[in-house]
Amino acid sequence: MKNKIDYSIYLVTDRDLMSTNTLEEAVEKSILGGTTLVQLREKECSSHDFYETALNVKKITQKYNIPLIINDRVDIALAVDADGIHIGQSDLPATVVRNIIGEDKILGVSAGNLDEALKAQKDGADYIGVGAMYSTGTKKDATSTTMNELREIMKKVSIPVVVIGGINKERIKDFNGINIDGLAIVSAIIAQENIEKSTRELKEEFDKLNTLI
C-alpha cells in the first residue's frame, strides 16, 4: 500500500473544530468529497477514548479504502492496526518509531526546515509534513516555513511532501509550480458547514496546480 498512497487531500482531524455531531461523520463526509488520507489527531482525550475513536474511524476509512494515520501515539496506531503514524519533532525519534512499527506501515514526520526534512528522510520517513506554511489557530506555537524553504526542501528530498498550516481554498494557488504531493488540511475541511462540498472544492483547486500559467 505504501507505494500507492495518494497524499493530495490529507485530512487532519480536530474534534474542537468539527461542524458535525461526531468525528466519524466528519471523516466520512470528507472522504465522500475527495479526502485521500486521514490523520486522527486527539490531543486531549484519554488513551481509552482515543483507542475507541480510532477503531470507529478505521471502520470508515477501511470502507472507502483510505489509509488511516494516527498522530503521535505509536501505541494507539499498533493497537488498532492503523496504516501508519505521524510524529513531530518533539516526539519519539523517527528511527525508533520505524523500528517499533516495522517497514510496512507509513511513517510521516513533521519538518519546518531543510535540516529537519533531510533528517526525517534519512531516518526512514515515508513522507514529510512541511509547515506551518501560514499562521494557524490549531497550532499556535508552530513556527512558519517560507515558500523558499519549501522549494529548497522539494529540491533536496526524494520522498513525498505535504504542506500544512493555514491551508485553505484561496491559498492553494500559492503552491503552483512547486510540485508538492499534497495538502494537509484541518479547519478548511472539518470546521466547514458542508464538509463534503468544501473538500471537493479543495480537491479541484489542488488538481489545478502545476497546470496554471
Swiss-Prot record:
<dbReference type="GO" id="GO:0005737">
    <property type="term" value="C:cytoplasm"/>
</dbReference>
<keyword id="KW-0460">Magnesium</keyword>
<feature type="binding site">
    <location>
        <position position="91"/>
    </location>
    <ligand>
        <name>Mg(2+)</name>
    </ligand>
</feature>
<feature type="binding site">
    <location>
        <position position="71"/>
    </location>
    <ligand>
        <name>4-amino-2-methyl-5-(diphosphooxymethyl)pyrimidine</name>
    </ligand>
</feature>
<feature type="binding site">
    <location>
        <position position="139"/>
    </location>
    <ligand>
        <name>4-amino-2-methyl-5-(diphosphooxymethyl)pyrimidine</name>
    </ligand>
</feature>
<keyword id="KW-0784">Thiamine biosynthesis</keyword>
<feature type="binding site">
    <location>
        <position position="166"/>
    </location>
    <ligand>
        <name>2-[(2R,5Z)-2-carboxy-4-methylthiazol-5(2H)-ylidene]ethyl phosphate</name>
    </ligand>
</feature>
<dbReference type="InterPro" id="IPR022998">
    <property type="entry name" value="ThiamineP_synth_TenI"/>
</dbReference>
<dbReference type="Pfam" id="PF02581">
    <property type="entry name" value="TMP-TENI"/>
</dbReference>
<comment type="pathway">
    <text>Cofactor biosynthesis; thiamine diphosphate biosynthesis; thiamine phosphate from 4-amino-2-methyl-5-diphosphomethylpyrimidine and 4-methyl-5-(2-phosphoethyl)-thiazole: step 1/1.</text>
</comment>
<feature type="binding site">
    <location>
        <begin position="186"/>
        <end position="187"/>
    </location>
    <ligand>
        <name>2-[(2R,5Z)-2-carboxy-4-methylthiazol-5(2H)-ylidene]ethyl phosphate</name>
    </ligand>
</feature>
<comment type="similarity">
    <text>Belongs to the thiamine-phosphate synthase family.</text>
</comment>
<feature type="binding site">
    <location>
        <begin position="39"/>
        <end position="43"/>
    </location>
    <ligand>
        <name>4-amino-2-methyl-5-(diphosphooxymethyl)pyrimidine</name>
    </ligand>
</feature>
<comment type="function">
    <text>Condenses 4-methyl-5-(beta-hydroxyethyl)thiazole monophosphate (THZ-P) and 2-methyl-4-amino-5-hydroxymethyl pyrimidine pyrophosphate (HMP-PP) to form thiamine monophosphate (TMP).</text>
</comment>
<keyword id="KW-0479">Metal-binding</keyword>
<feature type="binding site">
    <location>
        <begin position="136"/>
        <end position="138"/>
    </location>
    <ligand>
        <name>2-[(2R,5Z)-2-carboxy-4-methylthiazol-5(2H)-ylidene]ethyl phosphate</name>
    </ligand>
</feature>
<dbReference type="GO" id="GO:0009228">
    <property type="term" value="P:thiamine biosynthetic process"/>
</dbReference>
<dbReference type="InterPro" id="IPR036206">
    <property type="entry name" value="ThiamineP_synth_sf"/>
</dbReference>
<feature type="binding site">
    <location>
        <position position="72"/>
    </location>
    <ligand>
        <name>Mg(2+)</name>
    </ligand>
</feature>
<dbReference type="GO" id="GO:0004789">
    <property type="term" value="F:thiamine-phosphate diphosphorylase activity"/>
</dbReference>
<feature type="binding site">
    <location>
        <position position="110"/>
    </location>
    <ligand>
        <name>4-amino-2-methyl-5-(diphosphooxymethyl)pyrimidine</name>
    </ligand>
</feature>
<protein>
    <recommendedName>
        <fullName>Thiamine-phosphate synthase</fullName>
        <ecNumber>2.5.1.3</ecNumber>
    </recommendedName>
</protein>
<dbReference type="GO" id="GO:0009229">
    <property type="term" value="P:thiamine diphosphate biosynthetic process"/>
</dbReference>
<dbReference type="GO" id="GO:0000287">
    <property type="term" value="F:magnesium ion binding"/>
</dbReference>
<dbReference type="InterPro" id="IPR013785">
    <property type="entry name" value="Aldolase_TIM"/>
</dbReference>
<dbReference type="InterPro" id="IPR034291">
    <property type="entry name" value="TMP_synthase"/>
</dbReference>
<keyword id="KW-0808">Transferase</keyword>
